[in-house]
UniProtKB/Swiss-Prot annotation:
It is found in: Cell inner membrane. NCBIfam families: NuoD, PRK06075.1. It is a peripheral membrane protein. InterPro entries: NADH_Q_OxRdtase_suD (IPR001135), NADH_UbQ_OxRdtase_49kDa_CS (IPR014029), NDH1_su_D/H (IPR022885), NiFe-Hase_large (IPR029014). The gene is nuoD. This is NADH-quinone oxidoreductase subunit D. It catalyses: a quinone + NADH + 5 H(+)(in) = a quinol + NAD(+) + 4 H(+)(out). HAMAP family: NDH1_NuoD (MF_01358). The keyword Cell inner membrane applies. Its EC number is 7.1.1.-. The keyword NAD applies. Keywords: Cell inner membrane, Cell membrane, Membrane, NAD, Quinone, Translocase, Transport, Ubiquinone. It comes from Ehrlichia ruminantium (strain Gardel).
Amino acid sequence: MSDHVKITPMTLNFGPQHPAAHGVMRLVLEMGGEVIERIDPHIGLLHRGTEKLIEYKTYLQALPYFDRLDYVSPMAQEHAYSLCVEKLLKCEVPIRAKYLRVIFCELTRILNHLLNISSQALDIGAMTPLLWMFEEREKILNFYERASGARFHSAYIRPGGVAADIPEDLIHDIFQFVNTFPKFMDDVDSLLTENRIWKQRNVDIGVVSKKQALNWGFSGPMLRACGIPWDLRKSQPYEIYDELEFKIPIGEKGDCYDRYLVRMAEIRESISLVEQCLNRIPDGPVKTDDRKIAPPKRSEMKKSMEALIHHFKLYSEGYIVPAGETYMAVEAPKGEFGVYIVSDGTNKPYRCRIRAPGFAHLQAIDMMAKGHMLADLTAIIGSLDIVFGEIDR
């Protein structure tokens, strides 16, 4: 009898109903025993035709679609779209609105990373971080609700500014949150960072070199974990980021553990950014004074018939955007989220193209997981931080 047993390759379906699939991901795996030889990701199970739907909506009506792309960090998407429309309109945003945008975008980054780290830990088998982190996420979602009226799909950041100003007591509560939050992060650090099992499951798993990361179009924490200090908030500053002080956390190896460390460090940097904004935020309007874009105040509408007509026209017909095309990208929690709009001089976009960071990261899963064990795949997927709303669009 031969000592060598021939292992026949096996095809395995991972998802789309798998708890570690982070949504509706389907992977077709070619296995050589317990080792992954090839991965074929199947996308499109959450395709809703967002880009096409936007062509039939006015510029303001198109905004809520962006909340529903990466539904874990909604305000970052609204921000990219609003900046893009403002660039076409050549519209100036009040300074207080810029500060509010940065505050909520950085809270969104914390919201996103808390979910990612907790779900990555849960996939590997650590349950405590999920319970702890969801308690903190709830506080941020509460801030969302107090600012916009909605916990998730807020439609708060709009072309021309933000939907409404926030009350003084909300600023006070956010301040209290950022003062107590670093202590919570220290607790999470003590739970995971030097944990023996956590390190065994993440160190040297899914290693990506600098060259590979650039070739695959990585951005965000996925790129920075490879040692490339690329952050749009520093390299192509928008809003008031050039006035704020923050570091760009980078990794060394580009493995799952480095990606975790980068996200942990980014949470701390975001806390610092929110604190700086709260200390500096000036008084003033939160919407542009261009009445062709911003609706009149409620108090004005109660007195003036013209204001009421204006409000109705603005929300039914929308505003005309000058013909042209532009691309605008923001440093979303998952990477570079870009919006490309072509305007034909009407009240609806002629074409809107969305550049989702998760799409590029999912493409590289075959390269990252090849040669690893099946059990390591959950750690790799967790570290990718993918949400199918933005990948399938």
